[in-house]
Amino acid sequence: MKRLKGVIILLILLFTACGVEKEKGKEKEIEKLEYKGATNSYKYNLVIPQILNLQSEDISYFNLSLQENARLIIDELLESTDELKQDIPYEAIVNYQIKENNFGIISIVLKIYLYTGGAHGNTTLETYNIGTKNLKLINFESFFNENAQSYFEMKINDAIENEKKVKNTNGEEVVFFENPEVNIKNAVMYFEGDNIKFVFPLYELAPYSSGMPVFEFSKDEIKKYMK
């Protein structure tokens, strides 16, 4: 019954608090879809992108999966507040950035913040890269050849071992764990300008206080590893 009540509330909130706003300029094909809601127990503000005027199976999947993920986040938030009594409202915030680049790729970075109790919330990044020619989603395997993984991991290990200055997503210097295990497949990637950037999640290579490390490679440097 509690779950049914949550679903009914969720549907009401979705239909009454969903707004649309079109991006301007070069981003005119990206539409903002916004979900907002708040009570004494929780609050959420989820802003997700929707790609318009371009049609492909991957773009349809992208649009629908982001809508479904937003609904799941809200559903879980409602269920959590039903199950527990908390002093501080639980919170969910989602927003995104479109990264302009010279790779012919629509590169979108989704930032997700969730607080469901404890000392602090948790932030994660999701990235979505779509080729502007074939309108297909791009991942590490589809973009790079078989030699790329070992190259990137070698370069990242070298930067850590030699204590080169690496910054996190907030532009602050990262202090790494001792001898962290680098797996490039655990990072998300996006394209910006003439560079590709890899972002590792919290706790993967460094403590929470150091945030999410960002490693950047230029197009010229990685050209021989691109398919």
Labelled PLM ranges:
Residues 15-17:
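C-terminal motif of bacterial Sec signal peptides marking the signal peptidase cleavage site
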Residues 19-227:
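Compositionally biased intrinsically disordered regions enriched in Thr/Gly
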